[in-house]
């Protein structure tokens, strides 16, 4: 009977896959541009790719096949990133509303340049706060609530039109 030497090629390949999957999950969890739901979806994909790669390694018959399965598995796991659409879309929507509001402010009749600038500053401050709130949000629900509140705040900003009407009023009264 022939004695077949023990080999660690498959075990080592599977260990490399496990380590890569663990690293990728850490990277996914650290992605602040993704919501919890988007991260969970990416982690599921990593787990699926890990199981598939280890199965391919198990089913390989030669060292070359094992190495090919390992390389393909590592590459597949490495390419899995969470979607960042939720936060990206929310920021874009808020930014669009802020730009619309700035146009409206600049077209306010009887507002002085100073009054328009003061309102513009409030919109920009609201926009900056909104982006920060979106960045700090974890769940899709938190992102959506933050977006809704931020848009309402930004849309409520109007110039305090006082100087020109007051001047016109006092001229009218003097006349």
What residue ranges belong to the model's regions?
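Amphipathic alpha-helical assembly segments used for oligomerization, scaffolding, or translocation
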Residues: 1-175
């Amino acid at each position: 009977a022939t004695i077949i030497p023990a080999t660690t090629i498959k075990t080592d390949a599977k260990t490399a896959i496990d380590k890569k999957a663990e690293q990728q999950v850490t990277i996914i969890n650290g992605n602040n541009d993704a919501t919890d739901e988007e991260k969970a979806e990416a982690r599921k994909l990593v787990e699926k790719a890990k199981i598939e790669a280890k199965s391919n390694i198990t089913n390989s018959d030669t060292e070359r096949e094992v190495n090919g399965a390992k390389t393909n598995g590592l590459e597949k796991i490495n390419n899995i990133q969470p979607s960042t659409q939720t936060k990206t879309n929310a920021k874009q929507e808020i930014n669009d509303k802020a730009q619309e509001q700035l146009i409206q402010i600049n077209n306010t009749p009887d507002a002085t340049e100073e009054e328009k600038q003061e309102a513009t500053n409030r919109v920009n401050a609201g926009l900056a706060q909104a982006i920060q709130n979106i960045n700090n949000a974890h769940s899709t629900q938190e992102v959506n609530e933050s977006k809704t509140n931020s848009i309402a705040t930004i849309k409520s900003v109007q110039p305090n039109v006082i100087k020109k009407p007051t001047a016109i009023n006092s001229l009218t009264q003097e006349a």
